[in-house]
Amino acid sequence: LHYPHIDPVIVGFGPVAIRWYGLAYLTGFVVAWWLGNRRARGLHTDWTAQQVSDVIFYGALGAVLGGRVGYVFFYGFKQFLADPVWLLRIWDGGMSFHGGLLGVAVALWLFARSTNRTFLQVSDFVVPLVPPGLGFGRLGNFANTELPGRMTDSPFGMIYPCHADAIRAMNPLCTGQWEDFARHPSPLYQAFAEGIVLFAIVWLFSSKPRATGAVSGVFLISYGLLRVATEFFREPDVQLGFIALNWLTMGQLLSIVMIGFGIVLLVLSRRKAA
C-alpha cells in the first residue's frame, strides 16, 4: 500500500486556508454537541440545550489551548525555546491529547463552578462525547502525514512519501528507509481505537445511571489502555525517542498515569455507591 496523496489544504484564499486538520477538529466539536443534546434528552438530565452548547465551547477552547501547550511542553520544548512563535502555529500540526485533557479539565472546572455542579458531575456528562473527536483528530494526523508507524511487513503496511513535510521533519535527508519500507498507518489504528472502540465502551457504560466519577474513571482507564497498546505500532517522537526501558514512549507514560487516576476514580465511586 502507498500513502494516498492528500493535500493538507482543502481550499486556500490567499494567506487563509481551510485544512483537513482544522476540519477534523471542527467536526469533532459538532458531533460532540449533537451527542451532548441527545445525551441530555435521553437520560432525562437537568442539562439544558444552552448548557450543552456552553460546555462544548468551554471544552473546545480548553482542548485546543491545552492540546497545543501540552504538545509544546511534553514533546517539543527545545524547539519552543529556539522559536517561541512556533507555539502559535497550530496549523502546522502538533497537538497533545494529554495536554488537551488537562486543558479540558480546567475548562470543565470553570464551567462546573458557573452552574453549581461538581467537577465530576460535569466530566461524567462530557467524556462520552469526546471519543468521536479523538477519532477525527487522528484522521487529521493521517491527512498531515503525521505520526507514521514503525516498519512492518504486514499487509497493512503503508509506504509514506519522503517529500511530505511531516516526514522530512523526522528524516531531513530523506533516506531510502522511508520509501523502501512499509510502515504501520498508526493514525488509522488510533482513529479506530480512540474514535470507535473507546466511544462504544464509554457510551454504553454511561447509558445507565452510574455513581459520580465512574464514567470519568472508565474513560481514563479505557483510553489509557488503548493508547498504550496502539503506541507499539507508532514510531516514537523523533525528538524524544524511547524515554525508558528501550520501549516506553512519552504517550505511554502519560497514559499509564491516566490509568492510575481512572482506577482511583472508579474505586472511590464504588465506595460512594456502597
Segments the model singles out, each with a brief description of its role:
Residues L1-A274:
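A feature for loop-to-transmembrane-helix boundaries and adjacent hydrophobic helices
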